Amino acid sequence: MNTFKENRPTLSAGSLRTYTSILKNLAKQLKVSLSTPEEVIKHSKEITEHLKEVPPKLRKTRLACLIVFIEKSDSKQTEAVIKEFRECMMNDIKEYKSEVDKQELSERQKEGMMTLAEIMKKYSDLEKAVTPLMKKDKLTSKEFCHCQMYVLLSCLLLIPPRRSLDYTEFKLRNFTDECNHMLVEKRVPYFIFNTYKTAKKYGQQREKIPNKLATIIKTWTNLNPSEYLLQNSKQSNKISPTQLTNLLHSFFERPLSTSLLRHIYLSEKYKDIPALKEMKDTASAMGHSLGVALEYIKR
């Protein structure tokens, strides 16, 4: 992680964790050491070959990680390897953008797909089951898991769904102004987000939440001894984004993640809007950008 920090001091904490994890997993998969930039450069051909099996959407992030890691190496091969990685990454970005414009589900997303109505039905059934539990003074381990799932889904469904990181870093107590937390100001409850993927660009975000969600969080604070909103399966530490995803997979019995939930939410909300590719093609034919085209639309 030190190399990433030294090479890119402005990298967010989330990106540092992601890049460090990518490098460790890559070394494990290739069964080689990738502890230094020079070792990455040494094994660059093996890495490139290995990454051919990775979808462009994921590969571009792995390549960005590798470029940051080796970019200040004194090796004579650094420039050539960076050029190779960057060319592949730019092709992946182009291909990914093309796929995004098509607005088609990946095979993995198709496996996890549910309608918003189906998701809300599961949530409603869970709510009925845990309502008596939320009134208890203390929970068993199993009861805790059920209630925690209810809290998580409440956060994802009662307001527009955010990424996993936003809630794995959310604190119930012992927080500072720089933490993700709930704030009640002039009797109005808010979620405050400081740690999230695009925080460097947008800064602190304040999301007004419904009273129902605020009540759920207050009740949960009394039942959950941890300072964090969500605990891992052993209830010994805060949950990680990967563990949160696994919780959702287990509950819905399919690969439904926060990412897919965001797709489902937006697809339902904007279901009457024309396809993105069609809108871009029309804007191009009219000689202006998509942004300008949207400004022309009057409702």
Predicted regions and their residues:
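Non-catalytic DNA-binding core/recognition domains of DNA-processing enzymes
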Residues: 4-93, 260-263, 287
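Solenoid-like repeat scaffolds
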Residues: 9, 52-53, 140, 173-184, ...
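Short, polar N-cap/turn motifs at the start of nucleic acid-interacting alpha helices
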Residues: 254-255, 275-298
